[in-house]
């Protein structure tokens, strides 16, 4: 189920790499990269919430024997978001021809992942594996960001991104910890929460007038 996020990040990688190098000579390229990062995070958060909110339904695509393992899904999906952000950040060292940094970050992240697996799996099982991926990708992402800001500074809209992450986290916690026994009411409640997040996106960064097809009706 968590592979939904992996597929999204993989699709993004295929589309984004030629886009980055095509924009590398434009004067506003850094602004475009910052916007791409912001919308990547926004839409992966939408995917995260959608999967987690409807996990009670999605779990039926796998066998019942695997249901206890579904608790790793949010951790693995968050790790995939980190990996996608890391990939998004990774172009700075390619653009300035210092690709050795990519090897450094990957080696550090991989070392953390392997070490956590070796040390923690015997005691905590597959949960340790999920947290190892989360931590390894997270560290590589942070290293790439902070070193990149010194080598090839890009002004990411951290305030706006932080608001989206905080809102998504709040909605996720509400969905998880508000007890609603009836599955139909629970799905309706979670759909409302997801709609609130989408409405926030539209209000802040994606006005209806900018959406193809819909904008025709608004203009009328």
Residue ranges: model-predicted function:
Residues 3-7, 48, 84, 110-117, ...:
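Hydrophobic transmembrane alpha-helices of multi-pass small-molecule transporters
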Residues 173-220:
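Membrane-proximal transmembrane or re-entrant/amphipathic helices at the cytosolic face
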Residues 97-100, 107-142, 154, 173-192:
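Membrane-interface helix-loop junctions in multi-pass transport and translocation proteins
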Residues 43, 71-75, 101-105, 128, ...:
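Alpha-helical transmembrane segments of integral membrane proteins
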Residues 15, 19-31, 151-165, 211-216:
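Interhelical loop/hinge segments that connect adjacent transmembrane helices in multipass membrane
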Residues 19, 57, 92, 118-123, ...:
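Membrane-interface helix caps of multi-pass small-molecule transporters
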């Amino acid at each position: 189920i968590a592979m939904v996020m992996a597929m999204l990040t993989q699709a993004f990688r295929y589309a984004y790499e030629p886009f980055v190098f095509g924009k590398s000579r434009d004067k506003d390229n850094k602004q475009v990269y910052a916007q791409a990062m912001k919308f990547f995070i926004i839409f992966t958060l939408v995917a995260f919430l959608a999967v987690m909110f409807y996990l009670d339904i999605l779990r039926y695509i796998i066998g019942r024997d695997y249901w206890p393992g579904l608790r790793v899904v949010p951790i693995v999906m968050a790790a995939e978001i980190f990996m996608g952000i890391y990939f998004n950040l990774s172009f700075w060292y390619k653009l300035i021809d210092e690709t050795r940094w990519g090897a450094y970050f990957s080696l550090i992240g991989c070392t953390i992942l392997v070490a956590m697996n070796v040390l923690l799996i015997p005691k905590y099982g597959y949960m340790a594996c999920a947290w190892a991926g989360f931590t390894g990708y997270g560290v590589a992402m942070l290293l790439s960001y902070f070193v990149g800001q010194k080598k090839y500074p890009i002004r990411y809209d951290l305030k706006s991104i932080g608001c989206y992450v905080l809102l998504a986290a709040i909605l996720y916690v509400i969905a998880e910890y508000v007890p609603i026994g009836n599955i139909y009411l629970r799905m309706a409640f979670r759909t409302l929460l997801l709609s609130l997040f989408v409405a926030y996106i539209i209000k802040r960064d994606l006005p209806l007038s900018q959406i193809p097809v819909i904008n025709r009706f608004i203009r009328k």
